[in-house]
């Protein structure tokens, strides 16, 4: 990696644990805190809380003083998200996430949504955002086409944005690294953010690489 994108191994972390950080941390910082402008005391809704991005978003948002609601596809995944610090977890297969998000915020809505689904989720996300809320789309697992009520967007003064890091410049990614070093690295040393490593594979072994690929699928 370019030197500007490299960061020191956090105090008390192993090399394996540290290797789990950059991909998800850069994504969460740049989208939730830069584009989404999440502030302490606000409420974040994470679509897919048990994913790698979701796990990082839960811990980082909580460490920086936000309230976190997540969605996940099984009760077990919801429980895992709660164990990581999420305030509430919604099983999107058995509950309407938008209705639940409104209920959990006493009808006010959430301030920021980190969305990895898009598709028909966007219409419901617009409905459950608070006034001046921000929707940040970072993946389109549910489809690239979305429709929503533009009148609601105008009335609530919503911001709908999105990004992908892959196409960004080395200079841009290096700035994210510097921001993470300033704002996140002290949390890692203090234990406010803990590594979550599901399994470790030997990359030099063909079987290990195949097993890793199968697990990701």
Located regions from the model:
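Structured surface patches comprising rigid loops and adjacent beta-strands/short helices at the edges
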Residues: 1-8
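Residue-level detector of alpha-helix initiation sites
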Residues: 13, 50-52, 120
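Mid-domain Rossmann-like dinucleotide-binding core that forms the NAD(H)/NADP(H) cofactor-binding site
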Residues: 18-95
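Terminal peptide-recognition signature
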Residues: 28, 61, 81, 111-113, ...
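Conserved helix-to-beta-strand junction in the class I
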Residues: 37, 127-129, 187
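Glycine-rich cofactor phosphate-binding loops and adjacent beta1-alpha1 units
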Residues: 69, 83, 88-161
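C-terminal hydrophobic helical "lid"/dimerization subdomain
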Residues: 173-217
């Amino acid at each position: 990696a370019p030197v500007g994108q490299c960061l020191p191994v956090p105090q008390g972390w192993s090399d394996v644990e540290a290797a789990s950080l950059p991909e998800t941390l850069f994504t969460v910082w740049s989208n939730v805190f830069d584009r989404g402008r999440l502030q302490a005391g606000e409420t974040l809704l994470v679509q897919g809380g048990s994913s790698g991005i979701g796990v990082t978003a839960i811990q980082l948002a909580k460490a920086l003083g936000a309230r976190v609601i997540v969605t996940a596809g099984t009760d077990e995944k919801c429980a895992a998200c709660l164990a990581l610090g999420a305030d509430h977890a919604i099983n999107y297969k058995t509950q309407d996430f938008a209705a639940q998000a409104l209920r959990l915020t006493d009808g006010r809505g959430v301030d920021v949504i980190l969305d990895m689904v898009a598709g028909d989720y966007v219409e419901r996300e617009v409905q459950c955002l608070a006034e001046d809320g921000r929707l940040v789309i970072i993946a389109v697992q549910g489809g690239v086409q979305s429709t929503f009520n533009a009148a609601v967007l105008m009335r609530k003064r919503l911001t709908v944005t999105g990004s992908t890091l892959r196409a960004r410049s080395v200079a841009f990614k290096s700035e994210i690294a510097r921001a993470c070093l300033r704002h996140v690295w002290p949390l890692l040393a203090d234990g406010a953010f803990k590594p979550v490593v599901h399994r470790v594979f030997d990359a030099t072994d063909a079987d290990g690489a195949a097993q890793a690929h199968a697990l990701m699928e």
